[in-house]
Amino acid sequence: MDDWEGPIDTGGIPEDGSSFDVIVVGGGPSGSAAASYNALNGCKVLLIEKEIWPRDKICGDAVGGKSLSHVKELGVKEMVEKTPHFMVDSIVFGSANGNTVQVMLPQDEFEKKMAGYSLPRMQFDYMMFKRATEIVTEAGGSVIQGFNVKEVLDNDGAIVGVS
């Protein structure tokens, strides 16, 4: 079994009435990063994902160079490099009439492995969510899978929970 094919243990569901500084709805790459950064900055985070991992999602399957500094900072870049992937060295634009233009990415970024990667979304999302689960739970927060948020609860304009 590959590293992205097994279930991710997110622990138990927090008790009713639990309090959190931040609630992040959605455990894709952006939600996982938001939950991780908030937890690393001392917030007690609740990360909620409607699916149960592993899951797949249609995507272009690329991680751009500008996001790699965050991927590295969160401890996921090494995980990516240990799985099947391609390093991106250029971008090809194509038109309906078959013409193409290839734009090479900066050589120094490619040499530093910071130009970008191409890998299945399932792999990348899995690694981001798994790492977010580790960071959030180590900081005292909670992660829930298989929960679909139907309503954001507010009290005089302040978010007080979800259901």
Model-flagged regions — what are they?
Residues 23, 39-59:
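Glycine-rich FAD pyrophosphate-binding loop
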Residues 31-32:
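N-terminal Rossmann-fold NAD(P) dinucleotide-binding loop
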Residues 26-28:
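Glycine-rich Rossmann-fold phosphate-binding loop(s) that bind the pyrophosphate
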Residues 36, 40, 69, 130, ...:
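Short, well-ordered alpha-helices that flank and scaffold nucleotide-derived cofactor binding pockets
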Residues 1-22, 37-41:
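Extreme N-terminal leader/targeting segments of oxidoreductases
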Residues 57-97:
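N-terminal FAD cofactor-binding segment of flavoenzymes
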Residues 17-19, 92-163:
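Conserved N-terminal helical subregion
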Residues 42, 75, 136:
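Short glycine-rich hinge loops at helix-strand junctions in the catalytic core
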